[in-house]
Amino acid sequence: MRKAALAAFASAALTLGGCAGDADTTGLSGATWQVVALYTDPGTPGGLPADAAGRASLRIAGDSMNAMTGCAPLRAKVEQTSERLTLVDVEVADADGCIGGSRYVHDTLTSLLTPGAAFDVRKLNDKEATLTVVSDAIDRPSIRVMAL
């Protein structure tokens, strides 16, 4: 009886472990992620300017990312795992006439979201994540996003 109970427990643990592994492989795919903070300088708060709040977002589906920089659409081909996002090709539309906080967010995002850029992805929970630039720098730039 005890052996049967242990076998059932082991089988359930392996099944649940397999499910947990599948959940981790999605990375940021499937949700629309709103950019809520940009951390590029340790001496500067990362919050977005009031006139730019809610204007920048990104969505990843398969090997494609569609984003809005606050001023212009951005499209990229990506490679991803649950812990890494790498941009392969990036196209950004013209942002002429964009000013103020939205322009600041646009300029910051387009300086980070470049071909070859890689980010460590850290999901804080199902609705919040950070994308931190992969580099040897001590204070690596990062993008904080919230799922809509």
What are these regions (language model features)?
Residues 2-9, 19-148:
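Lipid interaction determinants
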Residues 14-18:
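C-terminal segment of classical bacterial N-terminal signal peptides
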